[in-house]
Amino acid sequence: VVYTDCTESGQNLCLCEGSNVCGQGNKCILGSDGEKNQCVTGEGTPKPQSHNDGDFEEIPEEYLQ
C-alpha cells in the first residue's frame, strides 16, 4: 500500500491524486489497476524529507499519545 504526501495543514490530511483531500483521521490509498484512490480510516503518512525546509510541521502532541 502506498500513501500520498500529506498537506502542510495536518499530518493526517493526505492528498489523493486529483486533489482529493482525505479528512482528519483518514489516509489515502492509491488505487491500482485503474481503481480510484480511496480515503480510509488511519493516520496519514508524512511526506519524505526530500523537499524544501518548511514543508513540514511538527506532529501535534495529541497525536503522539
From Swiss-Prot:
Disulfide bonds join C6-C14, C16-C28, C22-C39. Residues 55-65 have a biased composition (Acidic residues). Glycans are attached at T45. GO terms for molecular function: serine-type endopeptidase inhibitor activity; toxin activity. It comes from the Eukaryota. Residues 55-65 are annotated as: Interaction with fibrinogen-binding exosite of thrombin. Changing Y3A: Strongly decreased affinity for thrombin. The modification Sulfotyrosine is found at Y63. Transmembrane segments: none annotated. Gene3D superfamilies: Thrombin Inhibitor (Hirudin), subunit I. Keywords: Blood coagulation cascade inhibiting toxin, Disulfide bond, Glycoprotein, Hemostasis impairing toxin, Pharmaceutical, Protease inhibitor, Secreted, Serine protease inhibitor, Sulfation, Toxin. Residues 39-65 are annotated as: Disordered. It is found in: Secreted. Belongs to the protease inhibitor I14 (hirudin) family. This is Hirudin variant-1. It comes from Hirudo medicinalis (Medicinal leech).
